[in-house]
């Protein structure tokens, strides 16, 4: 079983890379977020999950052990296979997933193509007691910023306002989280202005 590969990226496709390790090219599937951080000709270390089936052997690569752990965790949910797990990780980081599950936020998962209401509910229900066992740093974020419990900045109302201004719900929630972590006492007006300013600046 292959657990790690270190080598140069020879080629990259829509959902995979070919990594050259001592002259041998391995085809490795990866999430969109991981692929976006890789460049052809550069050297990387990838954590590998090997899936052996009767008809094939597939390798799945991750830049962090946390992403690999969540790839496996997501597949423990009924209805999620390797392709759907990668799709979710292409849209959400492990920390995003942990925060969403802790906050029972099904909408973040429903926004992902192929994830319906029932599957989103299963993700939250089936992983609620499991995500705490995987360290991502989300516990620190969640202690200081629980979307459902912050009344001082009325975060849910701000998220709705940002969605009305053209943000996706995921973009709005991430923006609110980042701003409030840095300034917990920020007013609603300033929060909205800062979110818009950050978006226009590409932050």
From Swiss-Prot:
Broad class of where this protein is predominantly found: cytoplasm
GO BP field: DNA recombination; DNA repair
Keywords attached to this entry: Cytoplasm, DNA damage, DNA recombination, DNA repair, DNA-binding
Organism of derivation: Rickettsia akari (strain Hartford)
Region spans: Flexible linker: 143-149
A GO CC annotation given for this chain: cytoplasm
Segments of this protein annotated with the region Domain II: 64-142
Gene Ontology MF annotations: ATP binding; four-way junction DNA binding; four-way junction helicase activity
Protein's recorded name: Holliday junction branch migration complex subunit RuvA
SMART domains from the UniProt entry: HhH1 (SM00278)
Cross-referenced Pfam families: HHH_5 (PF14520), RuvA_C (PF07499), RuvA_N (PF01330)
Subcellular location: Cytoplasm
Chain segments carrying region Domain I: 1-63
Oligomer status and interactors: Homotetramer. Forms an RuvA(8)-RuvB(12)-Holliday junction (HJ) complex. HJ DNA is sandwiched between 2 RuvA tetramers; dsDNA enters through RuvA and exits via RuvB. An RuvB hexamer assembles on each DNA strand where it exits the tetramer. Each RuvB hexamer is contacted by two RuvA subunits (via domain III) on 2 adjacent RuvB subunits; this complex drives branch migration. In the full resolvosome a probable DNA-RuvA(4)-RuvB(12)-RuvC(2) complex forms which resolves the HJ.
Domain of life assignment: Bacteria
Domain notes: Has three domains with a flexible linker between the domains II and III and assumes an 'L' shape. Domain III is highly mobile and contacts RuvB.
Record region (Domain III): 150-203
InterPro entries: DNA_helicase_Holl-junc_RuvA_I, Hlx-hairpin-Hlx_DNA-bd_motif, NA-bd_OB-fold, RuvA, RuvA_2-like, RuvA_C, RuvA_C_sf
HAMAP family: DNA_HJ_migration_RuvA
Record's function text: The RuvA-RuvB-RuvC complex processes Holliday junction (HJ) DNA during genetic recombination and DNA repair, while the RuvA-RuvB complex plays an important role in the rescue of blocked DNA replication forks via replication fork reversal (RFR). RuvA specifically binds to HJ cruciform DNA, conferring on it an open structure. The RuvB hexamer acts as an ATP-dependent pump, pulling dsDNA into and through the RuvAB complex. HJ branch migration allows RuvC to scan DNA until it finds its consensus sequence, where it cleaves and resolves the cruciform DNA.
UniProt cross-references to NCBIfam families, sorted A to Z: ruvA
Upper lineage: Bacteria, Pseudomonadati, Pseudomonadota, Alphaproteobacteria, Rickettsiales
Family: Belongs to the RuvA family.
